[in-house]
Structure formats: structure tokens, C-alpha cells
Amino acid sequence: MKCVLSILLFFAVLLIACEKPAGPGGKAVIKGKVYAKNFDSYGYTLISEYYIGGENVYISYGSDNAVRNNVKTSDDGSFEFLYLNKGHYRIFVESRDTSIHVKNSKKTIAVVTELDINSVNQTVTLSDFVINK
């Protein structure tokens, strides 16, 4: 009887130990696009808007808010984070803070989306990130 319990306990621990945390190493994908609104130097007047290439998109995961990786958007504003495990993720992009109307203000804010990947092969397509430039 002790032998059977020991074997069951061993397999239970083995299954728990095999659970992969959020982050790289899986087959899931997070993708989306970044849309920019270009304002005048004071942040009042909208000059143009477009999907922006070359913009940094950041990812953090699990209970940690530290940036774990980043990618740049393609010319059409699209981005992808590939090969992710199941877990909790935060995707964010920096945006100019247009609530401050000072000429050429460099103050930025983070535009953040949080999500969970619940299956191994899941692909999550996010709503567009809208940022101010």
C-alpha cells in the first residue's frame, strides 16, 4: 500500500513540476497592430494618423511587471510575440502624454493590455493599440 501511495505521490509531483510558467518556450502567439495619431508640438491639433512601423512593443508576464522582451512593429504596424506558454501577459506601448500641453513635451504614458493564454496553441489577436506621437 505504501508503495502505491509513493508512486502516486511521485507522479503528482512530476506533473506539477512539468507545468511551464508564462513566458517563452510554448506554441502560443500574441499579435496586434499599433496605430499612431500624430499631434502638433503642443499636443492640441491632430496632424495625421496611420499604422506605425518601427515602434517598440513590450511584453511582461507572470506576476512580474519587468519587461521581458520587446519587438518592433512592421511597416504596417503589426507585431507578434511567438512561442509563448500558457499564462498571464501584459503587452504595452509607449505613447506621448497629450494631457500636458507644453511645446515638445517628452512625457510618455504606457498603453497596456493584459490577457491570459489558456491553451497551448492559442493565437490571441489584440485590439489596435492607439498611441499619440
Map each language-model feature to its residues.
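Sec-dependent signal peptide recognition
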Residues: 2-9
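C-terminal motif of bacterial Sec signal peptides marking the signal peptidase cleavage site
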Residues: 14-17
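A short, amphipathic beta-strand motif
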Residues: 28-36
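Short amphipathic beta-strand segments in non-cytosolic proteins
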Residues: 48-70
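Short, surface-exposed beta-strand/beta-hairpin micro-motifs centered on an aromatic residue
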Residues: 74-83
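A short tyrosine-centered beta-strand micro-motif
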Residues: 87-93
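Structured interaction patches on ligand/partner-binding surfaces of diverse proteins
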Residues: 96-125
